[in-house]
Amino acid sequence: MEEKFVGREKELADLNELYAQDRFQLFVLYGRRRVGKTTLLNEFCKDKKSIFYSAEQSNDKLNLEKFSAQVFGFYNESNLEPFSSWTNALSYIDERQAGERIVLVIDEFPYLVRKNRALLSEFQHLIDHSLKNGNLFIVLCGSYMGFMEKEVLGSKSPLFGRRTGQLHMKSFDYHDSMKFLENFSAEDKLKLYGAFGGTPLYLQQVAPNKGFEENIKDNFLKITSYLYEEPLLLLRQEVQEPGVYSAIIEAIARGYTKANEISTKIGEDAAKCLKYIKTLCELGIIYKETPFGEKETSRKTIYGISDLMFRFWYRYVFTNRTLIETGARDAVWLKRIEPDYANYMGTVFERVCKDYLSVKNAKGELPILFTSIGRWWGTDPATKSQVEIDIIAGDSDDYMIGECKWRGEKLDISVLNDLRHKADVFSKTRDHTWYVLFSKSGFTDAVIAESKKDDSIILVDLDALFK
């Protein structure tokens, strides 16, 4: 399915700026599947002389043969024997370009290196001895983020110090995702974002002339739809035991977020389960989270699902596939999705509100310039009860502490008072604290009056999220 080029203007501008420097470039582009890496590169290359090769999951010999054919086709050569090595292939391009600016893209680069571990060293040698003196623009692109970060960008990689630029390409945040959802109300935009996430190809499945319910039924509850089997197809492409990985994602989607809870739920050894979890993190499918201010090794570590479409699918589709495939899609909507969706949207809304603050922070439009943002959870020493803070953003001892409510009623003063108490549980030694209240349905008169008296209270409703 062809992906339209929407957004990514900054990323495209950055690539074109590097291209304009007219010297050797080694650019590394990575990010999980479907975020639009290939679409960005196609857009970048469309007005430039370029050789674009997408590696395949075959052996080194076959990849080299197909790469050779791509190169010979670019130079209008025929009846030539394939290159005997990658060094010969790259040297041929280097010699033929003769000062001409050419872009060489190798997509799915990890497929090549897994079959030929010496390839990275071959690249290193060529860069150091010839390529760096020319103006070839090389892009190495990959979806396995752990591999790209360690084997290509890492300090022990033969290519360490040779790259001239890199980009970790992520899914769109809610703000950029709205470019695909312009025909909907503010509430429906966020509800659709909660199901389709920020992946461009998934957002393109939304029909602008249909409502939220119809879009969910047509895209997730119809067995012929593009998204109906998408998560399973992606897992089969990336891992050898998709069933176990799928069980882990489902467990997290059902609320089992600690490592021991996940291993118990799926019936796997804890150590083995952690290996699977690490792989899913490296693929960008799940993420690791610790309370704000605590080390990554914290015993309070939990896991979440990065891609909202995966989160929706494993919560509502995976466990209901038998019903869906026997024609009960309307019943699945009425009994399983619609009654639970407001609860599901609570976590989605928190993510949206965090994105909102991050964008405002980057523009310098907040009372502080925070250096980190996250959630916090811990124990109230007075009551011995668990306390959770939806958002904490901080810089030194200045904090913005937020509460996010996706409810049908207006947020009242009790929520503000409770948030102040939570802030004290988190830390009593704060220099300055701002309280940010996010509400789907607005605020009571008492909350609005309090915010007018106290500049440390910031109110954000749905309209403000879209300004």
Regions found by a protein language model. Give the residues of each.
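A cross-kingdom feature that marks ATP-driven nucleic-acid transaction machinery
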Residues: T301-K467
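Phosphate-binding site recognition
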Residues: M1-D330, L334
